[in-house]
């Protein structure tokens, strides 16, 4: 048992020498959702606080991002989040995709699927109140409808 613990400790120490890349991709404000949709500041603040760490190129890495293997899991989570929806590159999405992503965002916020519980453990200030959830879902749906109307044939 003692040998197993020593081996595990050595492995834990060794993996600390393999950090994640915390470089955020460049941000072009002209492609950012909050800018192109002229999001009102109170709603923009909520989106930045509760969504942007995983769904933008403006991730603020927490202290535990220095500890492996937790950091590897965190990096994978952020990469997956950006792949699903990246507010920093929202303007590059086709209008149909924009509308679909906004519909999904509204549903996920309403159904309490976002922000993830695992994210809230390290970011309790990102937790949304019921009124914030309603406000965000309504905002996403409003922008979704505007996007669909503007781009209807």
Where are the language model's segments positioned?
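Extracytoplasmic electron-transfer domains, predominantly the class I c-type cytochrome c fold
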Residues: 72-122
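C-terminal capping alpha-helices of c-type cytochrome domains
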Residues: 111-114, 120, 124-150
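Sequence context of c-type cytochrome heme-c attachment sites
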Residues: 23-38, 87-92, 117, 121
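Sequence/structural segment immediately N-terminal to covalent heme-attachment motifs in c-type
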Residues: 39-52, 74
């Amino acid at each position: 048992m003692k040998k197993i613990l020593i081996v595990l400790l050595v492995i834990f120490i060794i993996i600390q020498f393999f950090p994640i890349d915390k470089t955020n991709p460049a941000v072009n404000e002209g492609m950012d959702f909050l800018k192109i949709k002229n999001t009102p500041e109170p709603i923009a603040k909520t989106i930045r606080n509760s969504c942007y760490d995983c769904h933008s190129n403006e991730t603020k890495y927490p202290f535990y991002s220095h500890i492996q293997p937790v950091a590897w899991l965190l990096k994978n989570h952020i990469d997956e989040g950006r792949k699903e929806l990246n507010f920093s590159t929202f303007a590059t999405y086709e209008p149909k995709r924009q509308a679909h992503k906004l519909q999904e965002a509204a549903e996920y916020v309403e159904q309490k699927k976002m922000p993830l519980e695992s994210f809230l453990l390290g970011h309790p200030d990102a937790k949304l109140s019921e009124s914030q959830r309603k406000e965000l879902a309504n905002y996403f749906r409003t922008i979704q409808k505007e996007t669909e109307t503007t781009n209807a044939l």
